[in-house]
Structures are given as C-alpha cells and as structure tokens.
Amino acid sequence: MFSFIDDIPSFEQIKARVRDDLRKHGWEKRWNDSRLVQKSRELLNDEELKIDPATWIWKRMPSREEVAARRQRDFETVWKYRYRLGGFASGALLALALAGIFSTGNFGGSSDAGNRPSVVYPIE
C-alpha cells in the first residue's frame, strides 16, 4: 500500500532547503546587513552592558531637555501636516457616516426595523 508518510521530508531536509533558498535569493546577506542584526550583535558584544546593565541603561536615558526637544519636534511635525490629518479624519468620518446610511437603508437605523415600526396604528 502506498504511504504519503514516505514523501514527507525530514526536519533537516526542510532546513537545508530553506537555507539554500535563502542563499539563492540573497536574503541571508540582506538579513545580516539589516540594522536589527547589526545592533543586536553590537549589544551582544558590548562588555559594559554585560558587566553592569543598570549603569549602561542609566547612561543612555535621555535628559529632560532631550525629551522636551523630541516632544517639540514631534508636535511640530504633526502641526506641519495638520491639514492632511484633518482631511484624512474628515474623510474617514464621512466614509463611516455613508456606510451607516447605506447599510441601514435610512438615516434612523433601527426606527424602521420590523420589530419597531415607525408608523403606530391605533389599537381597536
């Protein structure tokens, strides 16, 4: 009887295939040249960080002036693009309103639903 289990590659074969594909397409070089990997290697090889992590972190904490400057720069960036942000927000609001109107079929939504008729008939 034929078995599909024989066709399943082993873990080592899968690893080798993936490694070959990464090499073939140049992803390994891109990964090794990425900022994330370079920064990780730099931190792993930092002797001061290995000896005293608390002092290492404390030295790199930004001062109040640096935090204030960053906050000011961020605010200026947002202020610079305020018209674009306003346009995006108003467009999103308009899209939500139109979606509500078209999905319910009226402006009220549930007022014309079957369980709550908008026309009230007198009881006889």
From Swiss-Prot:
Entry keyword Hydrolase: no
Record-annotated membrane-spanning stretches: 85-102
Record has Phosphoprotein as a keyword: no
GO terms for MF: oxidoreductase activity
Swiss-Prot/TrEMBL keywords: Cell inner membrane, Cell membrane, Electron transport, Membrane, Oxidoreductase, Respiratory chain, Transmembrane, Transmembrane helix, Transport
Function as written in the Swiss-Prot or TrEMBL entry: Component of the ubiquinol-cytochrome c reductase complex (complex III or cytochrome b-c1 complex), which is a respiratory chain that generates an electrochemical potential coupled to ATP synthesis.
Descriptive protein name: 14 kDa peptide of ubiquinol-cytochrome c2 oxidoreductase complex
Taxonomy of the source species: Bacteria, Pseudomonadati, Pseudomonadota, Alphaproteobacteria, Rhodobacterales
